[in-house]
Amino acid sequence: MVFSTSRKGGRGVCPGTFVILGMLCALPGAVVASIGTAVVVPAADAVVLSRDDTAMATAASAALPAPGLSPDRLAQALRALVEQSRASGSPRPLGLAAGLLDRLPASQWTAEVYLMRATIHQRLHRFDLAEADLDQVLELAPGNRQAWLTRYSIALVRGDLDSARRACERLQDGRAGLVADSCRQELASFGEEPEQAYEQLTQALVRGDNLNTTERDYALVTQAEMATRLQLPEAGDLWQRSLLRDPADLYRRARYADWLLAQERAQEVLLVTQGFEAVDTLAVLRAIAMTRLQHPQQPRLVGELEERFAEARWRGEFLHEWEYARFLLDVKNDAQAALAAAQANWETQRAPVDRLLLRRAAMLAGQPSGIDESGQAGRSTL
């Protein structure tokens, strides 16, 4: 089985990093371009991003004849569509994937088919349905590490530390490795000694320098997440290194751009997001940077984003409450509306970035956030 990970459960730009463990996602020797003296990003020709994801996904669907469709072929096609959604940032291939599932009776579904449907639900923020499918996977294959890792990712994005700990324990069963180290130290970083947890993961990365390349890649992204949350100065370098390892990964690009915004480096955000205006999350971050810089092209991009958000709501595809709240707060300067969007986002997503957004929107709106701010170590939720 191909082992893959969906980092952080359901962030709109690709519910995170969908890394295929055992397959090399990085582009070795990718051409890079320097931005000023500090920022390095892949050159445009190092990134391959589909401009017509729906057409490609439709072709993939048409290539599967209903008669004689096997569970293995179905799982392979579903994985291709999920990857297409990840690469483009669009949910539309996921709708085609859902249609493919109807072409094989559920009585013939394998653990891998259930796993792919769980991933589809996860990307669409249908976390309860994803969990139900993961139950099916683990009933058929109790040791399926991909299912446990997906469960861990969903638990984190929902702020359910108890469930995340249980999933992480199963990832450690009988197998050491950087993925197990990553989840263990990431969870420890929410406790009383977060800096120690960060150092432990850093040491594990040093020890595992020659281990599975993609597991190492996963650990590096986790390290960057932890450094950002702990406000460590090396966070930017870690995001930069992570992005250079996989230039096509939209999640890393967005997290790096957001880190740059937090450092008041708006000009560099324009370079990191250049050419990715079709991806809502990156377009919003670009619009924030343009707003701060009073860029002459800001009104055009803002108008496009307003149209996209309106169309997405009309189509029933609105998955980007976090992005919409950021847009309202940092571009439109409408704290009250941003607070409503941040609260809607908090209903399903309770990762640290979601908490930070809700607290900031509430503060600027002069309203209580409604978040438990006890901050007790050993807590069961974020």
Q: Over which residues does each language-model region extend?
A:
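N-terminal leader/linker segments that initiate helical-solenoid repeat arrays
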Residues: G29-E112, R123, A132
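Residue-level detector of the short coil/turn that links helix A to helix B
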Residues: R92, H125, G159, E192, ...
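Alpha-helical adaptor scaffolds
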Residues: L115, T119, R216-D217, T291, ...
